[in-house]
Swiss-Prot record:
<feature type="binding site">
    <location>
        <position position="128"/>
    </location>
    <ligand>
        <name>Zn(2+) 1</name>
    </ligand>
</feature>
<feature type="binding site">
    <location>
        <position position="128"/>
    </location>
    <ligand>
        <name>Zn(2+) 2</name>
    </ligand>
</feature>
<dbReference type="InterPro" id="IPR032282">
    <property type="entry name" value="HAGH_C"/>
</dbReference>
<feature type="binding site">
    <location>
        <position position="56"/>
    </location>
    <ligand>
        <name>Zn(2+) 2</name>
    </ligand>
</feature>
<comment type="pathway">
    <text>Secondary metabolite metabolism; methylglyoxal degradation; (R)-lactate from methylglyoxal: step 2/2.</text>
</comment>
<dbReference type="GO" id="GO:0019243">
    <property type="term" value="P:methylglyoxal catabolic process to D-lactate via S-lactoyl-glutathione"/>
</dbReference>
<dbReference type="GO" id="GO:0046872">
    <property type="term" value="F:metal ion binding"/>
</dbReference>
<keyword id="KW-0862">Zinc</keyword>
<feature type="binding site">
    <location>
        <position position="54"/>
    </location>
    <ligand>
        <name>Zn(2+) 1</name>
    </ligand>
</feature>
<dbReference type="InterPro" id="IPR036866">
    <property type="entry name" value="RibonucZ/Hydroxyglut_hydro"/>
</dbReference>
<comment type="similarity">
    <text>Belongs to the metallo-beta-lactamase superfamily. Glyoxalase II family.</text>
</comment>
<keyword id="KW-0479">Metal-binding</keyword>
<keyword id="KW-0378">Hydrolase</keyword>
<dbReference type="InterPro" id="IPR035680">
    <property type="entry name" value="Clx_II_MBL"/>
</dbReference>
<comment type="function">
    <text>Thiolesterase that catalyzes the hydrolysis of S-D-lactoyl-glutathione to form glutathione and D-lactic acid.</text>
</comment>
<feature type="binding site">
    <location>
        <position position="57"/>
    </location>
    <ligand>
        <name>Zn(2+) 2</name>
    </ligand>
</feature>
<protein>
    <recommendedName>
        <fullName>Hydroxyacylglutathione hydrolase</fullName>
        <ecNumber>3.1.2.6</ecNumber>
    </recommendedName>
</protein>
Amino acid sequence: MKITPVKALTDNYIWMIQHGNHAVCVDPSEPSPVLEFLVRNRLMLAQTWVTHPHPDHEGGAAALWRGYMESPVYGESDIEAATHTVTAGTRFTFGNGQVTVWATPGHTDRHTSYLLETSDGIHVFCGDTLFSAGCGRVFTGTVEQLYDNFQRFNQLPEGTLFYPAHEYTAANLRFAAHIEPDNADIQTALKAAEHTPTLPVTLAHERRVNPFLRTEIPAVRQRAEALVGKTLNSGLEVFAALRELKNAYR
């Protein structure tokens, strides 16, 4: 199975998953890049997966379905183009892989991540939940939900690959360096982020550079406390403080 990022809009990635002469597209913000990819690689669209109902994730799903009406569109019930409604625990297949749906709200009150298990490991298509060195902004969900999902992600094998939907890595790493100026792994990742795409990333990598997965590290907690000017008594409080600090960071 081959997984390729296709650039769209300003900083979006539409992930294309190939098996034989069939493909899945994940979060098609617009149809044209997907159609061009399919034609160039002589592929048929087999499935579309949508993580949440923002235009830069579902904007091209309806047009793709009209062009490939035999190919299902997977998404929660608030995805207008969905032909196959998913909920937490929904399972289906693509090629030789098993897909499991996780409910991962926080960025939005309804958000889905798709875990694709293949012979070479677990691939997580996480939309706007986890970014490399960062996390999604909280819009209609809650920071508590986002924190809980990071704890759940952190229980996956360290070789798990994450496929976020945006190229935010360099900006996120600059914030991470602001939180942990002495973290050599962050400095190394910053240099590497000059070259894109920076994705996918392993869970092992994110544990070293993502402050939102490092809320139990004393240096992270102490830095967050110094910046917000109060004691933070739990991982959740550190996570919430980091999210507010990131919102204001320039």
